[in-house]
Amino acid sequence: QSVKTIYPTKDWAISDFVVTAPEFGAKAEPGFDNRAAFQAAIDAAYQSGGGVVYIPAGNYEFRSTQVGTKNVRVRQGHSETKKDFHFEYVLRLHPGVQLRGDWADPASHNGKVLGTILEVRVGKDSPNYDGSVESWWNDGQADNALRTTYTSIADRFIEMNAGTGVTNLSIWYPEQDIHHVKPYPWTLFQTQGDCATIERVTLVNSYNGFNSAPSELHYVLNSYMTALNKGIEVHVCTDIGRIENVRISPEYWANSGLPGAPSLEDVTAYTRANGTGYQMHRSDWEYVSYLYISGYKTGVWIGREPGFADAPNAQLYEVHVGGCGNGLYVEDVNPYGILISNSSFGAGQDGNAVYFYKDFSTSVQFNGVDFKGSVVGDGDGGVVSFESCTFSEYNDYALRMNRGNVLLSQCEFKKNAGHVYLGANMHTLKSVNSGDKSKLKVDNHS
């Protein structure tokens, strides 16, 4: 049946499973634990072959958890055994089920969080908020080669399985205190399978936002979040995850209008010292566009899976990062490389627009990218190319390349000096029509 919403939506809300219906019994009332009612509606939708579980506007509290089990191929020296590990979760979305509410876009309401709000009042200071165990797995993309990895057994608020969605709602942790921050489990956790979708969602003050565990085809779009520790984290996505039109910033908690919301200055002080906006480990052909991040210790982090060498390749378009300690931190990239275009990376005070770690040894291409702050390279064998880029607001040097190889083409430097520093272990610099009025100033110590 069609459900009438209070706030505008891009499509009709159609649902036969409304959580407040008598057969489920959810209540937007203080002190009422909605876990069982919501799970009953989710289970009913799944048993009917899938569908939308609808949540009318209101504040719904969650005060208890369920226990899940993960069977893991645990390492024992050079052999293995299987072992069960337990974790806690609040809601489990079965395949083919979408959880949908009535969502007000904060950008249209002066930042206010309105409509369907899920209040998480369980999980504070969980010892297993981001737990993992060393394990083995066979990589189907590499002739089933045996890999060492770490399997997440972390607690989570909503567990997402194949073909599930969380849309048109907000999630809030009322007991989080910016002056005494406590870890909470992941808000949204794609545990396995393909096609987990998060759309038109506001994460008001998650500790950790969305985790995509080994799977494929995650899709996060048209969403907002303040995450105090990690916003989005991707692990072993073996085909085409997508991030589109997502904004990660301290402002969404500060401007939420919800009780206890701290000042923007206080939230930024914490995230600038501790937080990472988007963290991509191995992902094969990740597509990221219109991602906006500000006020974090690290805006975008790209690198290896914990414990082994697999790293991502990706295309990033219209990614804009500002006011971060490192706008972009590149630990490593797989041999297919990373392409970044029509984007901008800005550093906060004493930060770097981009930093390449010593393990970087492949390729990153920047095309039409603005850098506000220094680009620093410590990668030994990699190639970094810049096409039609601009460099401004740097301190001593726009490019401080201590190692590696750099290609410059049609790049503009906004100062008449301090363009490039080449360290003693630098291999190659090639430049065409780049510099201040095409005059490139190089301080060569190689």
Task: Identify the function of each model-found stretch.
Residues P56-A57, A213, H281:
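Short His-Asn-centered micro-motif
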Residues G96-Q98, A162-Y173, D194-Y207, E216-K230, ...:
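Right-handed parallel beta-helix
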Residues D378:
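Short, conserved, surface-exposed binding loops centered on an aromatic residue
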Residues F38, T69-V90, L114-I158, I178-Q190, ...:
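Extracellular beta-strand/beta-solenoid scaffold signature
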Residues Q1-I178, V246, N255-E265, L429-S446:
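Extracellular "leader-to-stem" segments immediately downstream of a signal peptide or signal-anchor
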